[in-house]
Structures are given as structure tokens and as C-alpha cells.
């Protein structure tokens, strides 16, 4: 129910959120109960996420990445700046494009491209034109992701079950995923729910130091509290 609710709400706010439906399941004619069917995060003909397809003429490509516990898939796994410089212990996997397009050269390009973004985010001039983080990352997407996950106390966000994607000609955007532990369903009690958590996680650690990002998030939160996140909604 948490995933169903928040995926649908995110779909009204963000450029992309996974499609989700309740469905009744029958197996060999025997009723199994009510389940939640969820779209996996990927780009394809029948997917809601539409990224520019790879081209055989260049190794540059659109891509989607997942930060999570290790998948064990050596073909999809990459090492980025945050892992070897910031001691980020989670694994980064490529979820798009598929293995058909993942040549060693293209995989290396994706790893380098995302590492360049992380390096710029952790540089001393990360909030100064022309090197500012917002030149590479979509402000609205990163603020909405922060607000939705903090609002629901979804403490997996930003270090587990975390997805980020980028069209080859676009900016980085976040995608919500996995609210199983949200809304007071965490594995241990939340002692101080009035405190923020996402600000300590890898990319948001630096974003939270930027006054412009904080002000944009405050403005966005106030707007959402008048609508989709209001007490009456």
C-alpha cells in the first residue's frame, strides 16, 4: 500500500515515476489474493520512462543507474568517484541500457560520465557558474525526491534502492523507489522524526550545503503543503 500510494503521488509531481497497479492473482485457477504489480525502472517501447536509445556510432548514451546492495552482475556493475573517494560502500549498477549495448567502452564511458558529475558536485566551486551542479542535475527532480522521501521518513532513500537517470542530451534526474520501510514501517523506531536524514547521503550531502537548493526546497515544500501534501488531500 505504501508503494502504491507514493508512486502514484510521485507520478503527479515528477517527470517519471514507476507505474503501479493493484491486481488479483489466480494461479492454476486458485485465487492467491491481492498483489501490487509494479513497473521496473527501465526505458523501453512499453515503458513510461523514455530515454534516447544508444547508437552504434558513439559510445555516449542515455543511462539509468541504481545505487543499492550488490547485484552480483559484473557486466552491469561500475565504480564511480563516490565509491573510491568517499567510501560509499553500496554498489552502482547500470539498469539502462541493457547488456546488448553494454560494450566495455560504453560501460567505461558511463562510469566516467557519472564520476565527472560527482567530482563537480564535491568541488569547491560546485555552486558557482559555469561549474554549478544545476548545470548537470535537474533542480525540480532532486528537490521533489528529497521532499517525498523525508516526508515519508523513507530512510533507505539516497543509499539503497536509489535510482538516477539521464538522457544523453539532458540532466540527471531522480526516480523514487521502494517505500516498504517508509511511513513508520522502518526496521527500528525513528527516535527523532523531526530531523532530516537524506542530507547525510552521498549526493545530497553537498546539495544540502547550497543555500539556493535549500531555498528552492523550502519554496517547493510550502507549495506542496497547499496541495498534494496537505493534511486534507
PLM regions and their residue ranges:
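Phosphate/dinucleotide-binding and metal-coordinating scaffold of catalytic cores
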Residues: 1-233
Amino acid at each position: 500500500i505504501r508503494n502504491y500510494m507514493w508512486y502514484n503521488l510521485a507520478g503527479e509531481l515528477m517527470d517519471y515515476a514507476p507505474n503501479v497497479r493493484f491486481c488479483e492473482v489466480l494461479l492454476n485457477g486458485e485465487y492467491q489474493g491481492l498483489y501490487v504489480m509494479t513497473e521496473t525502472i527501465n526505458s523501453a517501447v512499453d515503458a513510461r520512462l523514455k530515454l534516447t536509445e544508444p547508437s552504434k556510432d558513439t559510445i555516449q548514451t542515455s543511462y539509468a543507474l541504481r545505487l543499492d546492495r550488490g547485484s552480483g552482475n559484473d557486466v552491469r556493475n561500475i565504480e564511480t568517484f563516490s565509491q573510491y573517494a568517499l567510501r560509499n560502500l553500496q554498489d552502482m549498477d547500470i539498469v539502462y541500457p541493457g547488456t546488448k549495448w553494454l560494450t566495455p567502452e560504453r560501460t567505461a564511458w558511463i562510469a566516467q560520465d557519472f564520476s565527472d558529475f560527482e567530482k563537480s558536485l564535491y568541488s569547491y566551486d560546485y555552486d558557482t557558474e559555469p561549474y554549478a551542479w544545476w548545470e548537470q542535475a535537474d533542480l525540480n527532480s532532486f528537490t521533489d525526491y528529497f521532499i517525498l522521501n523525508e516526508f515519508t521518513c523513507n530512510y533507505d532513500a539516497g543509499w539503497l534502492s536509489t535510482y538516477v537517470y539521464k538522457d544523453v542530451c539532458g540532466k540527471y534526474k531522480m526516480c523514487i523507489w521502494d517505500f516498504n520501510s517508509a511511513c513508520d514501517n522502518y526496521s527500528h523506531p525513528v527516535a527523532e522524526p523531526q530531523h532530516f536524514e537524506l542530507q547525510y547521503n552521498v549526493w545530497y550531502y553537498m546539495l544540502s550545503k547550497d543555500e539556493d537548493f535549500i531555498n528552492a526546497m523550502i519554496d517547493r515544500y510550502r507549495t506542496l503543503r497547499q496541495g498534494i501534501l496537505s493534511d486534507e488531500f
